[in-house]
Design a protein with these regions (language model features):
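Short, acidic/polar
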Residues: 14-23, 75-86
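Generic short alpha-helical segment signal, independent of protein family or function
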Residues: 52-55, 59, 89
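Divalent metal-dependent hydrolysis catalytic cores, especially in the metallo-beta-lactamase
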Residues: 7, 21-45, 61-73, 89-103, ...
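Glycine-rich loop at the start of a catalytic domain that most often binds anionic cofactors/ligands
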Residues: 44-52
Length: 174
């Protein structure tokens, strides 16, 4: 395999975008692009514009396919799931718990607040990608992932059994 896929890529935006996109495209044929920019890539239209900026930043003749994701927010319109499923370039919706990582301030405080979107994702077979960390003053930093599994992931699986989820520790060990 001479040019594999990168399944978790942060390209950022602005000056960093050109450098990281060119470097990535030399080694990888495709990459799943994370949506945690400022502002977040939360709509298909925003993902389309970001994808265009990525492609424009590549050297001429570069063969590289950015696979776009949307940033799940508690205000996301469930109709956005339908647009994502029909887009041909959005491969999933990424959930960042609020305050868990870089640019996660627009993230969700609980997946319970996103039920309508998650129901549409289940119906349309859209992948939910999880940044699986619990946040809050009651959470020990060393227990963030295990508490996320207990408080968010396991209830999510019970409520939405057909929802496609991607979370490495949960897949590997639970």
């Amino acid at each position: 395999m001479t040019r594999p896929d990168d399944w978790h890529l942060h390209l950022r935006d602005g000056p960093e975008l050109a450098a990281v996109a060119a470097f990535t495209a030399r080694a990888f044929a495709r990459a799943v692009v994370m949506p945690n920019l400022k502002p977040p890539v939360a709509t298909v239209d925003a993902a389309r514009r970001y994808r265009e900026r990525i492609l424009a930043a590549l050297p001429a003749g570069t063969a590289f396919e950015p696979l776009m994701t949307l940033y799940l927010t508690e205000r996301m319109d469930p109709a956005e799931v339908y647009r994502a499923a029909q887009s041909g370039f959005v491969v999933g919706i990424k959930c960042y718990p609020a305050g868990s990582t870089t640019h996660s301030d627009a993230g969700v405080t609980s997946l319970d607040h996103c039920r309508a979107v998650l129901e549409r994702m289940e119906e349309r077979d859209v992948v939910l990608q999880l940044h699986g960390e619990a946040t809050g003053n009651d959470v020990d930093p060393y227990d963030r992932e295990s508490i996320f599994i207990e408080r968010e992931l396991l209830p999510l699986v019970r409520r939405h059994p057909r929802l496609h989820r991607r979370y490495r520790p949960a897949v590997a060990g639970r």
